[in-house]
């Protein structure tokens, strides 16, 4: 293989060129032809059992070239990456077959150039403040209750008992709007914990005080619901079949034994562990928010000229992600605009701003990493494996076979960056 690189300053793009020729290309074409033959489908013959004379009629040079190109894209990229590259890409290079012939294959990898930035101050910044972390008794109780859910007892209530918050209710329901049933508003034998907020606001509260048998409740669908129902009143006909009370286990040492948590034997130790876990999570959230705000401050103090193509490409990627998220919610752009009242221009402006911030964040953090030269030690890698093993309940040796080492190192470097920025600012 031969490698060249070209810097296209005017367009803010770079290009790597890799040429495959000689024996390497000849051998690749032979392998490509064999692959095409092996996967060839001809009416009247089984795949891989087609007589050579018949097969040759269907194997065109373009099919062989296309297969050979697919075979060489990844090796060519690895070859280009292994060179002492002067041109630094900011995104994933896009491969293009510039020339394909019997003599050679030329692949071009196009990418946005990583712009030179003038990094502002990133230490001793006092304008971003750190929040203090406090854990309340109520928060500890809420987490303990979640643990208790594993051992909850369900006891049927008396026939004349009324529904209370926390009860488990089995019921049929059918929704009506303007006197007509609507799609998706009906179910039989549905089981619901009152107060779990599984239904729209007001639905579960309206069930409190009801008894067994038939009843009606009136609700209004919230603003962010599907366009067909958003902000509209509806009536639900209910048939309450069964009401059960939820009985939590006693919060004592016996509960702790049932939980079988490592290094926790008494309820007092359990409470301490819960408080410690909440504190760690809150501290991590505070730290992440602080660093996000800090990075935005560093961006303001830095000089960055983003290539127009980089912003456009990143905006397009965010648009695809956004549309995919809408699809998961049963929406599309048209329905989203109707619900929110936003125009195409407003949506594009928001996505463009997000794209710009994402690119600037990448460049600023990349520059800080480069300057500080964070070192990933074996101890840090092993500690990360142990944490993952504890988190998922899988042996560390098994985790090592499941996790990409480079991605793990990247995570560790990011953790080091966050810790560094948090410790040296505020």
From Swiss-Prot:
Pfam families, A to Z: FKBP_C (PF00254), Trigger_C (PF05698), Trigger_N (PF05697)
What keywords are assigned to this protein? Cell cycle, Cell division, Chaperone, Cytoplasm, Isomerase, Rotamase
- EC number per UniProt: 5.2.1.8
- Matching InterPro entries, A to Z? PPIase_dom_sf (IPR046357), PPIase_FKBP_dom (IPR001179), Trig_fac (IPR005215), Trigger_fac_C (IPR008880), Trigger_fac_C_sf (IPR037041), Trigger_fac_ribosome-bd_bac (IPR008881), Trigger_fac_ribosome-bd_sf (IPR036611), Trigger_fact/SurA_dom_sf (IPR027304)
Q: Name one GO molecular function term.
A: peptidyl-prolyl cis-trans isomerase activity
Q: Which PROSITE patterns match?
A: FKBP_PPIASE (PS50059)
What is this protein for, i.e. what is its function?
Involved in protein export. Acts as a chaperone by maintaining the newly synthesized protein in an open conformation. Functions as a peptidyl-prolyl cis-trans isomerase.
The protein's name is Trigger factor
């Amino acid at each position: 293989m031969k490698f060249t690189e070209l810097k296209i300053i005017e367009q803010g793009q770079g290009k790597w060129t890799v040429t495959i020729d000689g024996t390497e290309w000849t051998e690749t074409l032979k392998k490509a032809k064999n692959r095409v033959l092996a996967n060839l489908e001809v009416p009247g013959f089984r795949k891989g059992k087609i007589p050579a004379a018949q097969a040759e009629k269907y194997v065109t040079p373009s099919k062989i070239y296309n297969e050979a190109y697919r075979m060489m894209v990844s090796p060519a990229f690895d070859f280009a990456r292994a060179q002492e590259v002067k041109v630094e890409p900011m995104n994933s290079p896009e491969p293009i077959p510039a020339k394909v012939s019997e003599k050679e294959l030329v692949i071009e990898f196009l990418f946005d150039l990583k712009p030179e930035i003038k990094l502002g101050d990133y230490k001793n910044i006092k304008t971003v403040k750190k929040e203090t972390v406090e854990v309340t008794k109520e928060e500890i109780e809420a987490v303990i209750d979640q643990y208790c859910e594993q051992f909850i007892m369900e006891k049927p209530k008396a026939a004349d008992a009324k529904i209370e918050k926390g009860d488990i209710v089995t019921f049929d329901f059918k929704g009506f709007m303007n006197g007509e049933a609507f799609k998706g508003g009906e179910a039989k034998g549905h089981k619901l914990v009152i107060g779990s907020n599984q239904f729209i606001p007001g639905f579960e509260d309206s069930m409190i005080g009801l008894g067994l048998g038939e009843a009606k409740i009136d609700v209004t669908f919230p603003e962010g619901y599907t366009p067909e129902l958003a902000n509209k009143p509806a009536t639900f006909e209910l048939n309450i079949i069964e009401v059960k009370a939820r009985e939590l286990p006693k919060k004592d040492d016996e509960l702790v034994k049932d939980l079988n948590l490592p290094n926790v034997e008494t309820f007092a130790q359990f409470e301490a562990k819960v408080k410690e876990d909440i504190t760690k999570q809150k501290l991590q959230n505070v730290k992440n928010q602080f660093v996000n705000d800090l990075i935005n401050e560093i961006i303001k103090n830095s000089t960055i000229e983003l290539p127009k193509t980089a912003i456009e490409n990143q905006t397009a990627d965010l648009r695809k992600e956004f549309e995919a998220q809408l699809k998961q919610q049963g929406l599309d752009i048209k329905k989203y605009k109707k619900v929110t009242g936003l125009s195409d221009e407003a949506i594009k402006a928001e996505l463009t701003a997000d794209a710009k911030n994402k690119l600037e964040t990448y460049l600023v953090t990349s520059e800080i990493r480069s300057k500080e030269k964070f070192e990933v030690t074996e101890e840090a890698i092993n500690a990360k494996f142990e944490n993952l093993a504890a988190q998922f309940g899988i042996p560390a040796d098994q985790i090592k076979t499941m996790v990409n080492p480079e991605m793990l190192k990247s995570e560790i470097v990011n953790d080091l960056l966050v810790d560094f920025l948090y410790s040296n600012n505020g």
